[in-house]
Design a protein with these regions (language model features):
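N-terminal cap/lid segment of alpha/beta-hydrolase-fold proteins
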Residues: 1-24
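Alpha/beta-hydrolase active-site loop
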Residues: 81-103
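Alpha/beta-hydrolase fold nucleophile elbow
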Residues: 104-118
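Catalytic active-site module of serine/aspartate enzymes centered on a nucleophile-bearing elbow/loop
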Residues: 271-321
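Alpha/beta-hydrolase-fold enzymes
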Residues: 124-211
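Conserved alpha/beta-hydrolase
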Residues: 44-75
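Active-site glycine-rich loops that stabilize anionic/oxyanionic intermediates
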Residues: 35-40, 118-119, 252-253
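Short beta-strand/loop motif that positions the catalytic acidic residue
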Residues: 248-250
Length: 321
């Protein structure tokens, strides 16, 4: 297995995005693109990527705008860009996959999957709507969907905050809209990220990294809420390729997915939109970061076996919706 790092230009036209690829020996059994979550970076998935590469799956991912080593020239962390920059981040996912398919020499018939975690799962769901039929299957980890009324309230509140403080600012409201009362079920709290993982070592490593954590900007939360509104729209969901399989994975104690209830809402919405192959699994005892919990090897294996079982879907990638 070989790991390479390089950069490519974001759709914002100015930011070089850090990209990583984990390359097994050819022929590849499949390929997987990773879309990471809020306040983290793609190398947090190194152990998972090496596991898959050891089984013949090529893995590639990049740091989203304002994350990891993909901070724009103006130096603002956890900021995608001005209003509408959600579009850039979704475009980057599509463009990077096209680039990777060429770089890695992925042959026609080799299935290409997309995995999105947390914020990355919201971006992946936007990608499914905007670029239907371009991946063979999607894995959504730590996803959810706030009720429409709560989302509308959040959008109105963050618009006022942006006008008052500026989109590059941080505020208590923006942080509350990002993380809500996630830590409340886990009182007494050891850290502000107890909701993220039952694995204390994982949280401590996260907190010690200068590339992880931090308060999201008002502008990023504005873009995230806009994206959530898009992916919660029944009309938009009907644009997805209904033949491409989707796997929803979450910890039973993940507050982002409303302890499983929000994940089930997403599953129902997909089925109502006509998706033919939607599966869901909840892991007892696990919180938000199922790929970093103590029993993560079971999650790794489930993802690999699911991809293996859907390898025959490669012919559907260019299929109609």
């Amino acid at each position: 297995m070989t790991r390479n790092e390089f950069t490519f230009l974001s759709a914002d036209g100015k930011t070089e995005l850090r990209a990583v690829e984990w390359i097994p020996e050819k022929p590849f059994r499949a390929a997987l693109q990773i879309s990471h979550g809020l306040g983290e970076h793609v190398l947090r998935y190194d152990e998972f990527a090496e596991y898959l590469a050891g089984r013949g799956v090529a893995v590639f991912g990049h740091d989203h705008l304002g994350h990891g080593l993909s901070v724009p020239p103006d130096g603002v962390r956890l900021w995608f860009g001005p209003k509408g920059s959600w579009n850039w981040v979704v475009q980057d996912i599509y463009a990077f996959r096209r680039l990777s398919e060429t770089r890695l020499g992925i042959k026609p018939g080799t299935p290409v999957f997309l995995l999105g975690h947390s914020l990355g799962s919201f971006l992946a769901r936007s990608h499914l709507i905007r670029y239907p039929g371009t991946v063979d299957g999607t894995i959504l980890s730590g996803t959810g969907q706030p009720p429409a009324a709560l989302l509308a309230f959040g959008q109105a509140a963050i618009a006022e905050e942006s006008a008052r403080l500026g989109e590059k600012s941080v505020s208590r409201l923006a942080t509350a809209l990002a993380f809500g009362s996630y830590n409340r079920p886990f009182r007494p709290n050891r850290t502000m990220y107890d909701w993220m993982s039952a694995n204390e070592e994982n949280i401590d490593v996260f907190l010690s990294s200068p590339l992880c954590g931090g308060a999201p900007t008002v502008g990023l939360i504005r873009e995230m809420l806009s994206g959530l509104r898009e992916i919660g729209s029944p009309e938009r969901l009907r644009r997805m390729n209904r033949y491409a399989p989707i796997l929803l994975l979450s910890g039973e104690a993940d507050p982002v997915g409303d302890m499983g209830k929000g994940v089930a809402r997403v599953e129902r919405a997909f089925r109502k939109a006509g998706m033919r192959d939607v599966s869901m699994a909840l892991y007892p005892g696990m919180r938000h970061e199922i790929l970093n919990e103590r029993d993560r090897s079971a999650v790794y294996a489930d993802i690999f076996h699911w991809m293996e079982s859907r390898r025959g879907c490669a012919g559907r990638r260019r299929g109609g919706s």
